[in-house]
Amino acid sequence: LNAVKIKGITFVYNLTTNAILLPKYMNYLVENDVHLLISIDGSKQNNIYRVKKEGKESFDIVFANIKKLKDNHPNYFDSNVNFNSVLHDKNSVDQIYSYIKTNFDKTPYISELNRNGIAEDKKEEFNRMFHSKEDSIKQAVNCGSSYLKEIADDSHIVQLDIFMQSYFGNTYKTI
């Protein structure tokens, strides 16, 4: 990162991570003001699909690494760390908001499972796992979630996203 310095231009670096290797690179990321987007789908029960390469669950390691970053670098954590969660059959919009807001005082980005490129023999499994963000938001509203303001704000973003994708052929979609 230090090699890319041009007078008059400020570079901002963004990194998406599952936080498994966070302790190894933590000081470097903080020193270089790298913005982090940490992938976590909620509580340990919600995070069931995020496993390490050998198939073991990763939640306890991820949670400990995030807490370590927050405890050791609170200002960096407040300004540079955000969360992305993927909605599926083991979580809900309300559960995700509740968990991340309670534990990290952050409002997460929430994405649906990507519908593109599903192998024909995996479609049934995908359909079982897929949960609509719009339906999950409605469920949170109907249940009187304590995070209605955040969820409603996110709902407006979802509506804008649908509009943009419907009316403009070339859109760039991220989290």
Residue ranges and their predicted role:
Residues 1-31, 35-36, 40-46, 53-61, ...:
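Canonical radical SAM enzyme core domain
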Residues 48-175:
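Radical SAM enzyme [4Fe-4S]-AdoMet core and its adjacent flexible, acidic
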